[in-house]
């Protein structure tokens, strides 16, 4: 074997760092150029003032550069399930009577419940379960911490949120979040890992369809729903709702809004304004300007783009500590 000592230290020993540095620069030249270009563009007035949408376009460039420099793992995650809206004008199902017994009491049921307004909320003391996101990009681990706290599988402490955020390496996936980190699939996987299995990522064509499905899931499982707000960039934890009637019985019940725990609180967003206090009721009009169809700057998500996304419970979780 021929040993090249041309750039070694005296006697052919010692570090060959000049050559190594040159090699590193050659191998990373494109990355260095990309970083310089991004930094230069970032300082332009058009980007700072978002002239003609330059700010949004630049955010896409930054996202793609970040993805290129440090791509997330390409591995399976929780699939996104497309939900077909149910007809809202379907008649309420009335149990049949025993054949040959006109006017008899319905079999296996009492009389049809009265159509009355409902006000449902899983949380009576929002402050007992709420925690703000420690970092302004930690809405997903904060929202997950809130859900686990509500269900008794976690605590609303900075220590727990920080620990949970540090576990993302177990659940991140390119298909779930192109720019790495937390996506709705990671939220579902994290909940399952901490004793709350069965959460499903669902996609809807309308906000009304999303809210109807969310109310059904929350009512039947007694577990919160995670709504992907702000075009999929943020998480809201839905703990209850108001409706003109019980949506599990009356298909055409009108949903008037939802109770929300927003991890962004007490911050103020330059785009979305001041976050509401934990547990505040949000009308459908308020939801309509915050819970918006998925549109992410880092790339395309065929199963999610332009759809309303939620992480929805499908089974009743075992009580914390069960089986121990």
Residue spans for each PLM region:
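N-terminal low-complexity, Pro/Thr/Ser-rich intrinsically disordered segments
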Residues: 85-130
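Compositionally biased regions
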Residues: 7-8, 45, 102
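N-terminal intrinsically disordered, acidic low-complexity segments at the extreme N-terminus
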Residues: 1-14
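Short extracytoplasmic
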Residues: 68-96
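Active-site nucleophile-adjacent alpha helix/oxyanion-hole segment immediately C-terminal to the catalytic cysteine
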Residues: 116-170
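Conserved active-site-adjacent core of cysteine acyl-enzyme catalytic domains
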Residues: 2-4, 20, 26, 33, ...
């Amino acid at each position: 074997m021929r040993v090249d000592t041309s750039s070694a230290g005296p006697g052919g020993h010692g570090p060959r760092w000049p050559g190594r540095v040159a090699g590193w620069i050659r191998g990373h030249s494109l990355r260095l150029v990309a970083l310089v270009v991004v930094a230069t563009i970032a300082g332009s007035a058009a980007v700072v003032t978002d002239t003609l949408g330059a700010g949004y376009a630049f955010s896409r460039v930054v996202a793609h550069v970040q993805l290129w420099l440090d791509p997330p793992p390409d591995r399976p995650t929780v699939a996104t399930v497309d939900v077909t809206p149910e007809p809202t004008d379907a008649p309420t199902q009335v149990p049949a009577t025993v054949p040959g017994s006109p006017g008899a009491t319905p079999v296996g049921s009492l009389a049809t419940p009265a159509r009355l307004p409902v006000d449902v909320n899983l949380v009576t003391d929002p402050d007992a379960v709420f925690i703000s996101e420690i970092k302004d990009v930690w809405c997903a681990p904060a929202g997950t911490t809130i859900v686990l706290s509500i269900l008794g599988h976690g605590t609303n402490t900075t220590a727990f949120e920080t620990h949970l955020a540090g576990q993302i390496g177990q659940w991140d996936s390119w298909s779930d979040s192109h720019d790495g980190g937390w996506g709705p699939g990671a939220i579902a996987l994290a909940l399952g890992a901490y004793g709350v299995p069965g959460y499903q990522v669902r996609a809807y064509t309308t906000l009304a369809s999303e809210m109807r499905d969310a109310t059904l899931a929350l009512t039947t499982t007694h577990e919160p729903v995670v709504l992907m707000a702000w075009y999929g960039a943020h998480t809201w934890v839905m703990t209850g709702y108001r409706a003109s009637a019980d949506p599990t019985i009356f298909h055409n019940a009108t949903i008037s809004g939802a109770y929300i725990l927003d991890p962004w609180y007490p911050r103020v967003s330059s785009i979305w304004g001041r976050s509401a206090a934990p547990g505040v009721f949000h009308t459908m009009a308020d939801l309509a300007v915050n819970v918006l169809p998925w549109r992410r700057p880092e790339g395309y998500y065929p199963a999610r783009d332009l759809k309303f996304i939620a992480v929805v419970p499908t089974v009743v979780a075992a009580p914390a500590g069960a089986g121990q």
